Swiss-Prot record:
NCBIfam families: PRK05182.1-2, PRK05182.2-2, PRK05182.2-5, rpoA. This is DNA-directed RNA polymerase subunit alpha. GO terms for molecular function: DNA binding; DNA-directed RNA polymerase activity; protein dimerization activity. SUPFAM superfamilies: C-terminal domain of RNA polymerase alpha subunit (SSF47789), Insert subdomain of RNA polymerase alpha subunit (SSF56553), RBP11-like subunits of RNA polymerase (SSF55257). Residues 1-231 are annotated as: Alpha N-terminal domain (alpha-NTD). The gene is rpoA. Keywords: DNA-directed RNA polymerase, Nucleotidyltransferase, Transcription, Transferase. It comes from Prosthecochloris aestuarii (strain DSM 271 / SK 413).
Length: 328
């Protein structure tokens, strides 16, 4: 009897704690060991492989490197950069964009002041503090926003064609703020050695917890399906086919080179073929039946005997053996 693996029929959702950004999901029952297997895979993909939107760089008038200070602004450039990394976006497009701001003091520069020029994005944490400007301060800043996955260091955001004074920053694209899982024992009938995997997900609000686990599951499935549907590539098929054809060709060539005296034939048939200068199977199969019957002392009984021998070798009279470079 084939053992049927225990699998969950559906994913359970904890409705009591569910919200637009927080979700708890339960998968049960699972075979022992599968709680950690699935939990680890989901956690890694959720944190590193989901697409999101983040700031990739900035340009501030009068600032030419990231270790500068700005007159009339309490925070220095490194502090401003750290604050901008924390700004979370919900994007309406997959393309990169730039927005320009001009802020005059006194002012408290917040994430909500970052406005899309063509509605490409929405800032989610609008109250996030960016910088404090004194009464005579003025801040002109270009903010570059892009799409990506996981975490991308500043070095990778330094693309060609950027203006002088462009400051690339680390981008945290992942829309997942936190994800953890735990594994507990669960009962199925009289057995208590099955597992229950509990997955807790918190997003930044740009994607729902439900959509995030669905997308993560699809990413995993796309990779696992490569193994489930594994078969040799077309090139491997072609190579194997050519090899098989080469082997068949060589085997046939050797068979056609078989000497007539090595066949289990009567003395009469041997003598008839020898007198007709038919020395190999290749010589024999290149002849037609009518031609053989014209040879001296060669009758229908001998023809039947030869047919039986050729049938055993899967050969027949009247074959074209020129491609095997056989002497007919």
């Amino acid at each position: 009897m084939i053992y049927q693996m225990q699998m969950p029929e559906r994913i359970e959702v904890d409705e009591a704690t569910h919200s637009e950004s927080i979700g708890q999901f339960v998968a049960q029952p699972l075979e022992r060991g599968y709680g950690v297997t699935l939990g680890n895979a989901m956690r890694r993909v959720l944190l590193a492989s989901l697409p999101g939107t983040a700031i990739t760089g900035i340009k501030i008038d009068g600032v030419f490197h990231e270790f500068s200070t700005i007159d009339g602004v309490r925070e220095d450039v490194p502090e401003i950069v750290l604050n901008l990394k924390k700004v979370r976006f919900k994007s309406t497009t997959k393309r990169s964009c730039k927005t320009s701001l001009s802020i005059e003091g006194p002012a408290d520069f917040k994430a909500g002041d970052i406005v899309a020029q063509e509605g490409e994005f929405e800032v989610l944490n609008k109250d996030m503090h960016i910088a404090t400007l004194n009464g005579d301060a003025k801040l002109n800043i270009d903010i570059y926003i892009g799409r990506g996955r996981g975490y991308v260091p500043a070095e990778e955001n330094r693309g060609e064609g950027m203006p002088i004074g462009f400051i690339a920053i680390d981008s945290i694209f992942t829309p997942i703020k936190n994800v953890k899982f735990s594994v507990e024992n669960t009962r199925v009938g009289q057995r208590t050695d099955y597992e229950k995997m509990i997955l807790d997900v918190e997003t930044d609000g740009s994607i729902s917890p439900d959509d995030s686990i669905s997308l993560a599951g699809k990413v995993i499935n796309e990779h696992v399906s490569l193994f489930a549907n594994f078969s040799p590539t077309e090139e491997e098929f072609a190579e194997e086919e050519y090899k098989q054809q080469d082997d068949e060709f060589e085997n046939m060539r050797k068979l056609l080179q078989t000497r007539i005296e090595d066949l289990d034939l009567s003395v009469r048939s041997h003598n008839c073929l020898r007198l007709a200068e038919i020395d190999t199977l290749g010589d024999l199969v290149s002849r037609k039946e009518d031609e053989l019957l014209t040879y001296k002392n060669f009758g229908k009984k001998s023809l039947t005997e030869l047919k039986e021998q050729l049938d055993k070798c899967e050969l027949k009279f009247g074959m074209d053996i020129t491609k095997y470079q056989m002497k007919s």
